[in-house]
């Protein structure tokens, strides 16, 4: 009892600012219950720096007390001593649009810096008053529908640096454009539209002179008309993460781009020309090759220093890129492998990257085709010309997910025997501890076999991650 009383006194004797920080680590509805302890604790809740106002009740059980809880908690923002800077508001039930919007206005008018607004039910958001001079980070997610007039001066959030838009349906394309342009100092934009249950909400355009980081996930296979034209007018962009089905045409202004991460998805299964037959009815893969074109996208990222490609991207670039540009500035290339996707474009990528220093490959097993070139061992040695690896300047090779199979070992042998400038090889061995009862010995067998492979570079050292 004495120890408990001392601990209780230590907490109660702490300064209000410390207690406010402690309460900030608790869910808001738990922190709010401390107000019944004493008058002092009742005055501590305004000292928390974040509010989590979320409905986490099981589906079908409407939280009748949630609106009252939200309104009483948001009233804390009116206190002069309030230090609340971050608010997460998530509504799973309908509580009336006027009430919902009054909550939003309260948050925006009280100097909050970070606002996460989320709803699984459709709510209209009046854009004329959807504005804040202090907000730095904003996430709007779910069934929200911004519509109405622009704020005075056309500025929504003059201080906003980071904006995340997740499955939000704007009233029209102009409203979306105005919303982004209404954030004049925006540095990072995240657009996520990948849910067939809702129609696409992105018009394929991003225009902002200030954006430095752009992440887009746009995956609507049932809406090909939304993938016709993609336009990036982002002269300050340094980082691009783009995932979506390949479009018909790309246009961009991205002269500052340094790093790109691409996950280009095909509309149909792509077929090599040497695998096509004469029974062609005018539709399918060859029709896709005529109607979709990744050339513009690849050309506009050709100045990057770092490039990451998914396994789908490898095949899309091979089949739907008419001209491979020179990647003169590329220092690091990484790509993923898949047993259903080929490496046909890898030799061309390596030959187009004369200054490449680091090569990262996630998985060595890929689809065997007659057109994989000489970056791998898919074709017989006697039919190969000079290996593209011989002229490659790669100094660091990193392999992730190495399982030590016969095919993987042959591929590693091919790399080590041809990469003349190689200095460091980093390998992350993958052993299934659940299925392998002798995982430790399996790991040693894999690593020992790899260490015994001959190396053309006398400076090459192998490290295991």
Curated annotation (Swiss-Prot):
SUPFAM superfamilies: F-box domain, RNI-like
Gene3D superfamilies referenced in this protein's UniProt entry, alphabetically: 1.20.1280.50
CDD domains, alphabetized: F-box_AtFBL13-like
Annotated ranges, domain F-box: 8-54
Annotated InterPro entries: F-box-like_dom_sf (IPR036047), F-box_AtFBL13-like (IPR053781), F-box_dom (IPR001810), FBD (IPR006566), FBL60-like (IPR055294), LRR_FXL15/At3g58940/PEG3-like (IPR055411)
Pfam families: F-box, LRR_At5g56370
Official protein name in the record: Putative F-box protein At1g21990
The organism of origin for this protein: Arabidopsis thaliana
